A protein has these predicted regions:
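Short loop/turn and low-complexity linker motifs enriched in small/turn-promoting residues
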Residues: 4-5, 13, 17, 39-55, ...
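Residue signature of alpha-solenoid helical repeat architecture, marking inter-repeat boundaries
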Residues: 24-25, 77
């Protein structure tokens, strides 16, 4: 119609209305898709979908609330996954307390999906294991002074046993006239028994 009558207000109005209907249809489909992604606990995808919708129309309350909701769940889920991916970091008091706070926040989520419930169960399990003391046997030559960094001075001994929490550890040994030694090891509930041999044997 505009090609025939370029100045026709009726034709222009019709074209504008058609474009508006197309945009509304697109936004409706995006909202439906974002809601489905929330149901599937696909928080990153849902948040991005709501972001795209708001780029088209930033006044849509439904999209604003959806983006806020998805972003909140996205951040919580990501934070929990970071803890679950590196459980030995729970040996740090700060990390442990942060994980407990995440757990409390996770428990407050209403209508949690199966993925969220699994995250809670796994986080509870890791927090419990982080407090489990595991037996570690240290063996030396009765001449090397052994130190467990950030833990204690073990001194000289043939064998010594300690109860340690899961985590990453470093043991060092020193002996006059010999090269110092350093051993890094990790203690986890999924491994063991733990036996660490440390002694200075290389003369200087």
């Amino acid at each position: 119609a505009l090609r025939i009558q370029p100045k026709s207000s009726t034709a222009f109005s019709g074209l504008t209305q058609a474009q508006s209907l197309l945009i509304q249809k697109k936004i409706k489909a995006q909202l439906s898709n974002a809601a489905l992604q929330e149901t599937k606990e696909q928080w990153h995808l849902a948040a991005n979908n709501y972001k795209n919708i708001l780029a088209e129309n930033n006044s849509l309350i439904e999209a604003q609330l959806g983006q806020k909701r998805s972003k909140k769940r996205e951040h919580l889920s990501d934070a929990i996954n970071i803890v679950l991916a590196t459980p030995l970091r729970l040996s740090s008091i700060g990390v442990y307390e942060h994980a407990k706070e995440l757990l409390e926040s996770a428990k407050k989520v209403q209508l949690p999906g199966p993925g969220h419930t699994e995250q809670i169960n796994q986080l509870v399990k890791e927090l419990e294991m982080a407090k489990t003391l595991l037996l570690v046997a240290f063996r030396s030559d009765n001449s090397t002074k052994v130190t467990l960094l950030k833990n204690s001075m073990l001194g000289t001994f043939k064998e010594k046993k300690l109860l340690l929490k899961p985590g990453n550890y470093i043991a060092t040994g020193s002996r006059e006239g010999y090269r110092d030694v350093r051993i890094e090891f990790k203690v986890t509930p999924k491994e063991g028994p733990f036996s660490i041999e440390i002694a200075c044997r290389e003369p200087i």
